Amino acid sequence: MRWSNFFLKKSCYFSINRHISITDSDSDHNANAMRQSKELLERINKVVRHIEQAIDREMSLDELATIACFSPFHFQRIFKEIIGETPKQFIKRLRLEEAARLIAFHPDRNILSVAFQVGFQSLEVFSRAFKDYYSISPDTYRKSSESERFRITQMPYTQLQTGEKPVLDVVSLKPMQDFDDLSIEIVTRPPIQCVYLKTTLQSPKMVDESFKSIKQWSHIRDLPGSDATPFGVIKDYPIFTALDKCRFFTCIAVDNPAKISGIVNHFAISSKKYATFTIEGGIADIVEAAKFLVHAWMPGSGYEIVLEPVILIPLKDPTATPFKENSWQTHIPIQPEGRLY
């Protein structure tokens, strides 16, 4: 049985690399199937959250299967069907992409400390895994130019892709001088409680539909704060992660999150300091402006990037304005330079 077949309804989309519906089914059979599919998603979502929070330590298949209340065999099969990767592949990719980001943004950091931070128990094991994945050693990657590092981190995807490229084309990004008039401010945002749907940056249309879906979901349940405008959270940096794997949350801030299950999750964002700018356009435009921030504004600012989710606040209603046509107040997490992790 392919569990994703349950999720192909017409009303709206949700993605963990899939389109699925949150509408009522037209028959008792379909309603039962939908309930089962939501329960599966709830279990797998719980495992994904656990993996993200425990990325710095070893996790066995038995441990993850227990969290999902499946046998190891059934858990591995269902996880791959929903996520598109086995648990081992998913964990390895998250760890290595996190390591690549850490090395790229903080090249002075000790490679061994990076290995430990992303869950590897020795430098030898980490170096071998990094080279197997990126075809280059961590130390050589660190010494590479920025453009070469971007090429390297996208290689696992471009080598496998036979059709449309799922990665961001960094070669075509605008020159940094095009952003000389970009206004960058430092702000501290208060903590936020929100509910969200998870999609990816592979398709702007999927993102647009996900904004509509989370708005509809919260409105139907009349959640406190559900009249607020949805906003976005980028969980993975598109330069380092293929767009079809780059997790994007469409969120609604709520005063008191109700009990949630299935395709909708709860997300708490703590109070943080951000470097903020406003840019019009799609994900490539946002990344172009972020590159300017990193290379032109960050040096000498006394701050450095924190590798945590980026918040996108739309200036126009994202349920009525396509992603690429909106203007986004972009919040990139920062901390005082040299602060210990």
Describe each PLM feature range:
Residues S15, S21-H29:
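Compositionally biased, intrinsically disordered low-complexity segments enriched
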Residues D26-R35, E58-I91, A115-S137:
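Basic/polar phosphate-binding segments, predominantly the helix-turn-helix DNA-binding elements
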Residues E39-V47, I83, K92-R95, P107:
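N-terminal positioning helix adjacent to the helix-turn-helix/winged-helix DNA-binding module
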Residues K46-M59, R101-N110, F130:
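Basic, amphipathic alpha-helical hairpins
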Residues I51, F75, L293:
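Conserved hydrophobic/aromatic pocket- or pore-lining residues that grip, position, or stack substrates
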Residues Q89, E97, A104-F105, L112, ...:
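A solvent-exposed interaction/effector surface
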